[in-house]
A protein has these predicted regions:
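Positively charged n-region of N-terminal signal peptides that target proteins for export
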Residues: 1-7
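Bacterial N-terminal signal peptides
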Residues: 7-18
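Exported/periplasmic ABC-transporter solute-binding proteins
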Residues: 22-89, 93-250
Length: 250
């Protein structure tokens, strides 16, 4: 058996023990906004199993970087871009991070609307140019990549005029479902929401996966409990939830 799986199982077993239950922790968790659906389902399961309590805070990359250096926390499940910031990385314990999940990009339309062609770079370009309006979250790691794709397609300036910027991932699908924007352009798991349908993923030449990593904070008040939650995110139960939410585990 894989040694990492054995270690994860042992850590989780300790967290589930009567001794651990008697010393239940309250963990402050910082997480990428695009992990909201997955962690809101997995969090209560972990709490029920271990007795620990999770205080989940979801935010985009710029806000997460600020949060890591402004207040105590116990662990993060964050876009890897957060770890590229030296000040933010220094707030996490030394040692390897774990790859929790990854997700690609796509385009969504309102449910029932005709799905445009996004299968090739040129098709995606023409679809974006023809759209009356688009929406995404510019101030995020995922949004930064969307902007790069616009520039690669040579339509960066054209997109500025028709973009309706959102401040949280969940608002993207809501705007499309309400008819406030014709297209949603973002991570595919965020676009899997009521009232919207995925027109398709970005074509292979433009596709990239945003990786979410997990790590315990250097100042965690209960590092073993924090590590137990990260280990829980690698279990078959968690893997099943991630897949159901449109996220690729690991």
């Amino acid at each position: 058996m894989d040694k990492s799986l054995v270690a994860a199982a042992l850590s989780l077993a300790i967290a589930m023990s009567p001794i651990a239950a008697a010393t239940a922790a309250e963990l402050k968790v910082l997480a990428g906004g695009s992990m909201t659906a997955s962690l809101k389902e997995l969090g209560p399961r972990f709490e029920k199993t271990t007795g620990h309590k999770l205080d989940l805070t979801f935010a985009a990359t710029p806000e997460l970087i600020k949060m890591t250096t402004s207040a105590p926390f116990d662990l993060g499940v964050v876009p890897v871009d957060v770890m590229k910031n030296d000040a933010a990385r220094a707030t996490f314990a030394a040692g390897p991070m774990i790859n929790v999940a990854r997700v690609g990009y796509g385009v969504a339309v309102r449910s029932g609307a005709q799905k445009p062609d996004v299968s090739t770079p040129d098709a995606l370009k023409q679809t974006l140019l023809k759209a009356q309006s688009i929406t995404f979250l510019p101030e995020s790691a995922a949004g930064a990549y969307v902007l790069k794709v616009f520039d690669r397609l040579g339509i960066g300036d054209a997109m500025k005029a028709k973009t309706k910027a959102q401040t949280a991932p969940g608002e993207i699908a809501k705007a499309v479902a309400a008819g406030d924007a014709e297209l949603g352009v973002f991570l595919t798991n965020v676009l899997m929401a009521p009232g919207v349908e995925l027109a398709g993923p970005f074509p292979g030449e433009l596709q990239q996966e945003l990786v979410f990593v997990g790590a315990v904070a250097a100042g965690s008040k209960d590092a073993p409990a924090a590590k137990a939650f990260l280990d829980f995110l690698t279990t078959p139960e968690a893997v099943g939830v991630f897949k159901a939410k449109g996220v690729t585990p690991g």
